[in-house]
Amino acid sequence: GNDKCKDTLFRYIFTDLQFALPLVNAFLGTSYKNPSSIEITTVEDMLQIAVENETLILIDCRMMLCEKRPAPNLFTYMPFLDCYCLYVNQKQAEECSQDSSRENELPEPCLYRLYNGTKEDPEIQMLKLSDLYKPKVINPDSLLGEVEATLEVEVPLLNIHKGLNEELMDICAPLREYSECIDAVKEEIRKGRSTREGIVQMLNTMDPGASIYAKIQSGRAEVERMLETEFNLNEYGEVLNEADTLEKAVEICKKMMVNPLCTIQMIQELTGFTEDEIHEIQEKLQSR
């Protein structure tokens, strides 16, 4: 794969202001109607939405790394922290250049991770950064023994499988329609179709009345590529979860490398290998 970050269907849809507005309203309980109220950028794999310079919404939506993971890993949190710190640093630099004496206010961060789970998975789980802290033996009589961890990040993990989190879906029709697209492909695969066949069938039978229909169909070739990438990565992730040796993980890494749709970043996140380790595996693969 190459190093260029590949887009996802979720970001393809929700970087469009007409679809981002109802998403913002669904998460914040607001009723914004003017697209100029929000500013959308994409950083790393995140959809970053700044709402009137007061609130920063960071949304990460993906199929992989969620459905069969027994516990969240570091990647659940680090992209959120990196994106928020980058945004704050940029805003502070802008404001300081205008008035260095004024105390800067920070935008309230709203962090969400969405995933296409199953109907049996919980609608919502709360992921905490402190769950990843390495336990330490602390003297209970010391100051550290009397206080909890001083740095905490909580990220709601929302299952957007069809029929779940209906309150969100009722407010944001594009989110419901996105979820239905993913579920439709999964259903076709369960019937025995290949991933590509399932994607094509979903696109051929998609409801023309859906708000995202025109955007999906106008970029159909790109949508097919994005969905095929996401489903392939999800499949790699499920196989990787069952890999009980380093050798098996390396073999999966090699399979991803020969897939032109897989980037180094995707391989890193899915396997846990560093970039140097991936390049080393790649060199051995090419020297054969």
Can you name each region flagged by the protein language model?
Residues 1-168:
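Accessory alpha/beta interaction modules
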Residues 4, 8, 27, 56-75, ...:
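Short, charged alpha-helical interaction segments and adjacent helix-coil junctions
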